[in-house]
Amino acid sequence: MHTLVDLLIHTDTRQSAILVPEDGTEIGYGSLSDQVDRLAARLRHSGLDPGQVVAIALPNGIEYLVAFLTATRARLIAAPMNPTYKAEAFRFFLEDFAARIVMTTSVADAVREATRALSLPVWTASRNATGDVQLSGPGGSASTKDTPDAPVPGDIALLMHTSGTTGRPKAMPLTHANVTASVCHIAAHYQLSPADTGLVVMPLFHGHGLIGATLSALFAGARIVLPDRFSAHAFWPLVRAHTVTWYSAVPTIHQILLARAASDNADSLHRRSYASLA
């Protein structure tokens, strides 16, 4: 795998890719790939040029993954942001990213306040009951035959910020080659395969949640269960209901789950990851 476009190409299109446990919505790899191609054409025909930055302020869900993969498919740079930021924080990160547009929900008041102050276009992400994502925003229209040229390994795919614990947060660019190398290594190390089901408990704006838990599973052709947030109370019921074989999290989450293990009648998983990537 050389770019994030390759993430979906090798996978059986009939295989289940993402399940949202809150409402039971499930999409396969074929649907995911088709949506990304269609929406990538829409983005590029809106007037954006390769290498420009698309900020993403969305909660965990199908919408987030489609938005992220769409941006990178269109040779744009995805810049994830914590969707719970206040308007002041959004404004700082949007300016620092030099974002050209923002993808968010219809009810994201703080990010919309920041975009108004910066005169940035907003694209609203939504989906229907079958998992089809729509991106509504300014610009032209296009069909899948207008799919833009694929990215190359040296293109920047992702902009993330350091935590800022020792000073001002700094933007950290990652190329398609950087991201795919990490994804391939993680999938190989944990021997992930289409037989696996992963439970995503980390936020997707976090490198660990996006790269370590999610993209690595998709590269392996595995299925992911994607709740909108981590819930210790819901963890083991989800594991049992969906035959989860692995998850990846920071140590704090492991500690929370271990503390509840006896009372929750905890089962065992085949694999688990402890290292945070960002």
Language model features with spans:
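ANL superfamily adenylate-forming
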Residues: 108-153, 260-263
